[in-house]
């Protein structure tokens, strides 16, 4: 056998290979096999590797987003940051530092996902603890990481279509490249199976071979060729599986000969992708217009339902005769599903609207129209299952429209009676008077509550709150119409309820016409809000049978009077109603209204110059340190266990809307200024009195905390201004005190919030002068022998008559020990009060006396316990001896005699100890009586000295 055949080829027969040993040629290590050599190897660049890593991570992020796996999204995002850091040199080199569009698009999608997940509080509650934690971490890291891509993100938000086109091109190129590779592999492998001919250099389509040897192999190629012929009919795989051609595919089919089908398909897909991305940016209210545009383009809109039906079921059969009974039965059938678990609330509203259209078309009368519209209102109320949450704005606008139309029907047809006292069996729809079961007042009360919820949900500092506040005009108009309707019915209880709703929208609003009418600037027949409130409240006082409505009406009436400076009317209402005694038994909403009334009453008293009354009104609110919570204007942060989640949720529901808030800084400033005007003269008058009481604990704490500071700078906050003014007043410097209270900063913060700010500022300066004068006299009365009244008037810029009246009042009240000399216009001091050294000596003597008494009581307690303990011990010994004697009665006489002698000796010792104790007690009693006698003599001498001084003063 020749050496040629000894080498062994792949085409040798089995017999030849078995008969001769095959001599294999040694192959170098790390060489590729024949099969691997046949496959074309691709060498990827660094750019392709980095971009492929990024695309894989982006795909994993999208997959994790679909299932809301926040932990995996966070992990993938961290991998993305590391991968992009590695790819950054390639981006700087290949893209000239421009961020790849696929990266920008992925970041934008992730930003939308993170924001939506964070804003959706309900879904966040359903997340696990790890996912919640991962979402917070992801949000922080993403917001920090996204700062470097702000410009790219803005460009993407402005034109997302450009980014979508490039991504589609990349995907199409990848698909095209993969298809070409598959074709190349088939071309290279298939001829090897078909024949042993030499392969051509260029890849060509495989044709079936007619040889008999290859007939078995050729069947596969035939099937492939036939399938490829069938596939050739379609431009793409997408067209193959389409149920019917669309507009886009028709355009592709009718493309000009110069443009290939693939290119036309690319353009069409890019166009639709850009439209889809742009639609994502549109608001929800434009979806209806988008659907209309899609219908024009050839899309078929399918409205899915729970039952899977594509069309809305018909209300009645085609040949059915529509009458009142049929419509009412259908209405009852629709409303029977109200409140059930699987009821589609949106579809229920649509059913009712369709039923309303049918009733209007067949002209079934006003009663049926009122019944259907009232049920539509109820269905809209039921659409929001959350009691505490506010309804959507689209439902709110529809609710306003439906109630307005319903009221028009009720006011236009006086023979239609809508009342909840009418039973379903006695409803009348055909003949007048029409009777329908329902309560318009309840619907309006629910509407008012929903309006309040909407205001609470909005940010008070945004334009949205202003827009929602504009809805108060239609709400108040609806209440006015219901007032007219209820007054026509004549039910007193319902009239009181709707009057109270009208009061709730009126009591906190300031009417400048009231003050103008008081000054004579308006005609006398002008009806102001005060007169309107007086009429409404008086009716409730007379007709209401429940305490709650009457109490709320009184509180609102007082609030409105105080708001318009009717101080005496407001004060008399408070005193006559005795609300302060029974308010603790009221519900929380009424207690909040009471707190608001007291705050506004305090402001009114301050504007009228009644400083003491203002302080008394505000002290209960400010002493607690929680005026914000007491007025329902927000929650103060508390410790973890002081307030549970349920309590916090309930308190948030009780909060007042922002436009009804009372300025807390204004309240605190008025309270502190009132406390300063009362506390500083009192402190000066009772400087050496150890038992003096504090008028205002809060003001006293502010003053003491300021005195403890080693370095005190110029005042900045409102509290610091008041404390600085108080320090100036203690020295009698009224000018500095007034400058601290009335200045540009304080005017902006506080005083300009009053209606007549200039009058309030003048009133405060007048009181500061008067109280500074009183403080000056209390502080320096022991220094002067006499003081000139004109000098005091000039010093404090007060008229002489005012200074004279102030000093006379102080002398009459025995606050100042002095006398007025009218001819010389001087104040003569009587020197009745002790000097500073004498006062300190008397304080020291009192404290030493109290200390001695306390020590004596402690000593007596200790000595008494000691002696009592010894006596008990002797008594116990007696009992023991007596018990021993009883036990030893049967013993011999000697032992009994010894025990008796021992007992006698013990009794003798106990008697001596008792005599000594009595002697000690008598001695201590004598000493205590002697000291008490000395103290009594000292007190009598001091009282005699004071009586002599008083007599001298009187003379």
From Swiss-Prot:
Which Gene Ontology cellular-component terms appear in the entry?
Answer: eukaryotic 43S preinitiation complex; eukaryotic 48S preinitiation complex; eukaryotic translation initiation factor 3 complex
Q: Where is this region: Disordered?
A: 1-22, 157-299, 865-955
The UniProt keywords, alphabetically, are: Cytoplasm, Initiation factor, Protein biosynthesis
Molecular function (GO) terms listed?
RNA binding; translation initiation factor activity; translation initiation factor binding
Q: Where is the composition biased (Basic and acidic residues)?
A: 230-250, 911-955
Q: Which residues form the PCI domain?
A: 658-834
The superkingdom of the source organism is Eukaryota
Oligomer and partners: Component of the eukaryotic translation initiation factor 3 (eIF-3) complex.
> Can you name this protein?
Eukaryotic translation initiation factor 3 subunit C
UniProt lists the gene as eIF3-S8
């Amino acid at each position: 056998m020749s050496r040629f055949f000894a080498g062994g080829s792949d085409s040798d027969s089995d017999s030849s290979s078995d008969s001769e040993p095959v001599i294999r040629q040694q192959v170098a290590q790390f060489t590729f096999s024949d099969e691997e050599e046949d496959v074309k190897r691709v060498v990827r660049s660094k750019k392709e590797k980095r971009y492929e890593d990024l695309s894989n991570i982006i795909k994993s992020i999208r997959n994790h987003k679909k299932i809301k796996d926040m932990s995996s999204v966070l992990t993938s995002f961290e991998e993305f940051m590391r991968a992009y850091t590695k790819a950054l040199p390639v981006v700087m080199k290949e893209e000239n530092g421009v961020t790849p569009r696929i990266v920008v698009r992925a970041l934008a999608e992730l930003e939308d996902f993170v924001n939506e997940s964070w804003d959706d509080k309900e879904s966040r509650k359903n997340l696990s603890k790890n996912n919640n934690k991962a979402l917070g971490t992801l949000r922080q890291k993403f917001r920090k990481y996204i700062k470097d891509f702000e410009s790219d993100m803005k460009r993407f938000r402005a034109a997302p279509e450009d980014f979508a086109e490039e991504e589609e091109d990349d995907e199409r190129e990848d698909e095209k490249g993969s298809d070409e590779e598959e074709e190349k592999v088939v071309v290279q492998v298939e001829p090897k199976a078909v024949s042993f001919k030499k392969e051509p250099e260029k890849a060509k389509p495989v044709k079936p071979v007619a040889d008999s040897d290859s007939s078995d192999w050729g069947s596969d190629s035939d099937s492939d060729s036939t399938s490829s012929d069938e596939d050739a009919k379609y431009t793409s795989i997408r067209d193959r599986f389409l149920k019917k051609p669309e507009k886009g595919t028709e355009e592709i089919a009718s493309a000009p000969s110069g443009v290939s089908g693939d290119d036309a398909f690319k353009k069409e897909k890019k166009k639709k992708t850009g439209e889809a991305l742009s639609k994502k940016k549109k608001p929800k209210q434009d979806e209806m217009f988008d659907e209309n545009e899609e219908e024009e383009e050839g899309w078929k809109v399918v409205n899915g339902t729970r039952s899977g039906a594509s069309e809305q079921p018909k209300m009645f059969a085609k040949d059915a005769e529509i009458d009142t009974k049929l419509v009412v039965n259908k209405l009852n059938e629709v409303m029977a599903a109200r409140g059930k678990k699987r009821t589609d609330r949106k579809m229920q509203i649509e059913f009712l609207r369709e039923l309303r259209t049918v009733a209007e078309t067949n002209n079934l009368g006003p009663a049926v129209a009122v019944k259907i519209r009232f049920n539509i209102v109820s269905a809209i109320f039921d659409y929001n299952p959350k009691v505490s949450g506010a309804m959507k704005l689209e439902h709110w606008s529809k609710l306003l429209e439906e109630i307005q139309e319903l009221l028009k029907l009720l006011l236009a047809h006086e023979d239609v009676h809508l009342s909840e006292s009418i039973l379903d069996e006695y409803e009348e729809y055909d003949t007048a008077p029409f009777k329908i079961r329902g309560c318009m007042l309840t619907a309006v009360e629910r509407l008012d509550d929903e309006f309040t919820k909407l205001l609470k949900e909005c940010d008070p500092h945004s334009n949205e709150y202003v827009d929602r506040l504009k809805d108060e005009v239609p709400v108040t108009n609806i209440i006015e119409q219901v007032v007219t309707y209820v007054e026509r019915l004549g039910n007193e209880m319902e009239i009181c309820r709707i009057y109270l709703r009208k009061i709730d929208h009126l009591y906190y609003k300031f009417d400048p016409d009231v003050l103008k009418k008081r000054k004579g600037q308006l005609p006398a027949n002008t009806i102001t809000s005060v007169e309107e409130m007086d009429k409404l409240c008086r009716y409730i006082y007379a007709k209401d049978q429940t305490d709650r409505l009457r109490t709320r009406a009184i509180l609102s009436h007082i609030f409105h009077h105080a708001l318009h400076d009717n101080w005496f009317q407001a004060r008399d209402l408070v005193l006559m109603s005795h609300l302060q005694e029974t308010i603790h038994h009221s519900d929380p909403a009424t207690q909040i209204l009471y707190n608001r009334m007291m705050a506004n009453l305090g402001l009114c008293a301050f504007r009228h110059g009644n400083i003491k009354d203002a302080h008394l009104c505000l002290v209960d609110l400010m002493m607690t340190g929680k005026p914000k919570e007491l007025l329902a204007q927000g929650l103060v942060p508390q410790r973890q266990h002081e307030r549970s989640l349920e309590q916090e949720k309930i308190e948030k529901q009780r909060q007042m809307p922002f436009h009804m808030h009372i300025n807390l800084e204004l309240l605190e400033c008025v309270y502190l200024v009132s406390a300063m005007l009362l506390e500083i003269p009192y402190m000066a008058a009772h400087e050496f009195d150890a038992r003096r009481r504090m008028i205002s604990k809060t003001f006293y704490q502010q003053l003491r905390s300021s005195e403890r500071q080693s370095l005190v700078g110029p005042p900045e906050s409102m509290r610091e201004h008041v404390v600085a003014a108080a320090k100036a007043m203690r020295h009698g410097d009224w000018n500095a005190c007034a400058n601290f209270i009335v200045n540009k900063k304080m005017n902006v913060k506080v005083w300009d919030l009053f209606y007549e700010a200039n009058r309030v500022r003048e009133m405060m300066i007048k009181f500061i002068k008067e109280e500074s004068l009183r403080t000056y006299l209390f502080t320096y009365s022991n220094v002067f022998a006499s003081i000139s009244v004109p000098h005091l008037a000039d010093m404090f810029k007060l008229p002489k008559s005012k200074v004279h009246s102030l000093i006379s009042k102080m002398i009459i009240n025995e606050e100042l020990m002095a006398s007025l000399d009218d001819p010389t216009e001087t104040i003569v001091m009587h020197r009745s009060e002790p000097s500073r050294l004498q006062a300190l000596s008397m304080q020291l003597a009192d404290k030493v006396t109290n200390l001695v008494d306390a020590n004596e009581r402690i000593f007596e307690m200790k000595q008494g316990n000691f002696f009592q303990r010894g006596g008990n011990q002797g008594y116990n010994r007696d009992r023991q001896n007596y018990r021993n004697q009883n036990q030893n009665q049967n013993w011999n006489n000697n032992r009994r005699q010894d025990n008796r002698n021992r007992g006698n000796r013990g009794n003798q010792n106990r008697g001596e100890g008792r005599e000594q104790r009595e002697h000690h007690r008598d001695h201590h009693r004598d000493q205590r009586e002697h000291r008490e006698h000395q103290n009594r003599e000292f007190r009598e001498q001091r009282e005699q000295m004071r009586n002599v001084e008083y007599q001298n003063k009187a003379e």
